[in-house]
Amino acid sequence: MKEKDKPIGIFDSGVGGLTVVKEVIRHLPNESIIYLGDTARVPYGIKSPETVIKYSRQNTNFLKERGIKLLVAACNTSSAVSLSILREETDISVIGVIEPGARAAVRNTKTGNIGVIGTEATIKSGAYEKAINQWSVVSGQWSGKKIEVASKACPMFVPLAEEGWFENEVAEMTAEVYLSDFRGKRIDVLVLGCTHYPLLKKTIQKSVGTGVILIDSAEETAKEIEILLRERGLLSDGKSRFVDFYVTDNPERFSKVGKAFLGENGLSRLSAVDLSNY
């Protein structure tokens, strides 16, 4: 198989990474994709850094064995904790979801007040604050000015997304508890720092108000994938395109939630896999 026709490998702790898959399909409809959702061990956000690194390595080994041309860590927790390690240990390009989201936040803020929500591990790592502040200097947009980043861990959003509870009363009440603090901070941009969170986008937007721009790291990541593949001459012509999905537990539940935003036939090629030997 030609290098450009090899699939893109994408992994996440569960269904959240399907938000990245959806955006990759929208931006790059000719590309083949292999997706791995580690549903047996979701969520990653409450695990220790050592455990997240172990899981991320196993996910990477599984996808590399299937001949991918690019690896996407479509999990903010994995991106925050293990991305640099995966890049050191892997001989193919590795893209995370934090850097694209941080760059988009800096581009879109007018006040310099940016909010970030994510899992406990992502927020504790400070990865978004670091990336936002670095990019604000590199871009020159906020040179000499200080960007204020307000962060909040929202761990219950992940199980809500995994259950498919995107817009019901429970989701709205949970969002209100988590996000009410942002109203006094006068943010004009809120980064959805977990790939599960775009599934709750309408509920989150309702809570923070229409005056706050929501940054979807999934969409920004898909744009960066397109740029990288184009620069390296690795865009596929789509002649042998396929999209395969693997999960580590409960494929029926994964399929039910996944179909809610990928469509009825979006997960037709779905299999269960054991990662213990990876």
Positions of PLM-derived features:
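Non-catalytic structural scaffold of enzyme domains
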Residues: 1-278
